[in-house]
């Protein structure tokens, strides 16, 4: 069992702050403007003259966005774990193992967020506003309700994957033992210790992967069917 302060800080930073705030924000900033930014900067013409179909251009740009955001998430995760466990007595092999699992789960989450916000960017002009509202209402509010509606959120599946692969049980200085994740995420580990009512690990991976592919595919189709107009500068 890990010491409570380290586990609690790990949980607070890696599984509350980063997934609920930073991951959606990173994805929103990078993915929502894949096409809009090109239009506003009047650089989309340079992309459209290339001998590539629009759907393929969108997919290539989305893959580049996935790569960029995943690299950022990996760096953020590593720095977070170094800061948490730098002066602890936890073996670095255990820290590295935990960091690897956390980075893998959060990378899948940010890829899914990018796919969602990329689609939103094609459907709405005010994609940043809609993305913030989605993050606050859906991923912030609905995901924290002990109802089946939370199964429609990205963060729910990341939490289940984390709970099935990482140990959040902590022993406090007074000897009390608690599972910080189960309490905060409203998982009934007393009556359902195996979480039989929740998806299995690979089911969660499959759900998020399918969601990413579907959102990217729909966005690529929309990109193919849409005519993009660029404002030309007025002549004096």
Regions found by a protein language model. Give the residues of each.
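Transmembrane-helix signature of polytopic, membrane-embedded enzymes
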Residues: 42-43, 130
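Secretory targeting signals
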Residues: 1-34, 41, 58-125, 161-164, ...
């Amino acid at each position: 069992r890990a010491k409570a302060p380290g586990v609690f800080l790990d949980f607070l930073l890696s599984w509350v702050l980063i997934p609920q705030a930073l991951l959606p924000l990173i994805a929103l900033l990078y993915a929502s403007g894949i096409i809009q930014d090109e239009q506003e900067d009047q650089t989309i013409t340079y992309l459209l003259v290339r001998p590539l179909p629009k759907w393929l251009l969108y997919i290539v740009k989305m893959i580049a966005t996935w790569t960029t955001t995943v690299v950022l998430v990996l760096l953020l995760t590593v720095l977070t774990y170094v800061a948490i466990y730098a002066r602890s007595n936890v073996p670095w092999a255990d820290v590295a193992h935990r960091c690897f699992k956390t980075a893998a789960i959060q990378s899948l989450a940010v890829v899914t967020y990018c796919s969602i916000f990329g689609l939103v960017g094609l459907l709405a002009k005010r994609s940043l506003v809609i993305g913030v509202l989605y993050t606050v209402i859906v991923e912030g509010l609905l995901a924290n309700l002990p109802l089946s509606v939370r199964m429609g959120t990205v963060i729910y599946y990341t939490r289940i994957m984390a709970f099935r692969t990482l140990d959040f049980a902590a022993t406090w200085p007074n000897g009390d033992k608690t599972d910080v994740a189960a309490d905060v995420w409203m998982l009934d580990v007393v009556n359902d210790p195996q979480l039989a009512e929740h998806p299995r690990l690979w089911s969660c991976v499959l759900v998020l992967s399918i969601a990413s592919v579907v959102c990217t595919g729909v966005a690529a189709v929309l990109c193919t069917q849409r005519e993009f107009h660029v404002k030309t500068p007025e002549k004096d």
